[in-house]
From Swiss-Prot:
Recorded name of the encoding gene: eIF3f2
Protein name (database record): Eukaryotic translation initiation factor 3 subunit F-2
GO molecular function: metallopeptidase activity; translation initiation factor activity; translation initiation factor binding
Keywords: Cytoplasm, Initiation factor, Protein biosynthesis
Assembly and interaction partners: Component of the eukaryotic translation initiation factor 3 (eIF-3) complex. The eIF-3 complex interacts with pix.
Main subcellular localisation: cytoplasm
């Protein structure tokens, strides 16, 4: 497809790509204001379909309006992805934010080389969800300027549609249904492991409240101190390393996200095995 026909193309995007971008934004390093990554997909006779993506580490230099991408990392991840999905090609890049950033022209030059004959697409995702909606906009750069003079880039909007296959619709409806449900019963049916974590956390909270009340009563001379209890508390406190609350919160949330991801994947695998077993039984009959 010609570079000049990129804006006329029909562009579809898989819902999983948007979930990947949101997950990358939630896991971004502390201090980073945005997430940048590569868009992968297929181009079938002018019909683009964005099916995958991955995040590329970067370093921002706002004082000189420059962003340094880890090109070596991007090349390695792209090679690994090509081994797994040989039909996917680089279609452009994504960036989180409300609008096209000033560094978009610099990133466009890099991805123009990666895309070859196809004009790179630029996806902007507002992952803050302040308006309770996921805002997505797709752009394609067009060269502007006078012949023989200085030329620049103008990013024009490109129509973007979410590709909803049968499997995608089932997953999205399940997510929507669970998000609208409230109460412990629904949570217990969907992710019982998370309910166990909540119950264990409540039990720890009750035990901590009991210990704090005991210490307060001893300090207020309302209760006689017990040397055995004191030594046990000292041993328990010294056994746990002192950790900053923010670091502990970050570590806990990271482990919780990993656990939820593992639960989701295991549930999907279990469902797929059950469906395969039923299909096999139908074929035997």
């Amino acid at each position: 497809m010609s570079r000049n026909l990129g804006m006329r193309a029909k562009v579809l995007i898989k819902p999983l790509v948007l979930f990947q971008i949101i997950d990358s934004y939630e896991r971004r390093p502390k201090g980073d204001n945005q997430v940048i990554g590569t868009l992968l997909g297929r181009n079938k006779e002018g019909h683009f379909e964005i099916t995958n993506c991955f995040t590329v580490p970067h370093k921002e230099h706002p004082e000189i309006n420059r962003i340094d991408l880890d090109i070596a990392y991007a090349s390695e991840i792209l090679e690994l992805n090509m081994l797994t999905y040989p039909n996917e090609r680089v279609l452009g890049w994504f960036c989180t934010g409300k609008s096209v950033s000033r560094s978009a022209s610099l990133l466009h030059d890099y991805y123009a080389r990666e895309c070859g004959e196809v004009q790179p697409l630029h996806l902007v995702v507002d992952a803050t969800l302040k308006s309770q909606r996921l805002s997505t906009r797709l752009y394609c750069a067009v060269e502007i300027g006078v012949p023989g003079g200085t030329k620049g880039l103008m990013f024009s909007l490109v129509p973007l549609e979410i590709s909803n296959g049968n499997s995608d619709l089932v997953a999205l409806r399940s997510i929507e249904k669970q998000s609208l449900q409230q109460g412990t019963k629904q949570l217990d049916r969907f992710i019982p492991e998370l309910v166990q974590v909540v119950d264990a956390t409540r039990d720890i909270q009750q035990r901590l409240d009991l210990v704090l009340r005991y210490i307060k009563d001893v300090l207020d001379r309302k209760r006689k101190p017990d040397n055995v209890v004191g030594r046990a508390l000292h041993a328990a406190l010294t056994a746990v390393p002192v950790m900053d609350p923010d670091k502990f919160r970050l570590m806990f949330n990271t482990n919780l996200r990993d656990m939820l991801m593992a639960i989701t994947l295991s549930t999907m695998i279990k469902t797929q095995l059950e469906i395969s077993e039923k299909l096999s039984c139908m074929q035997d009959q």
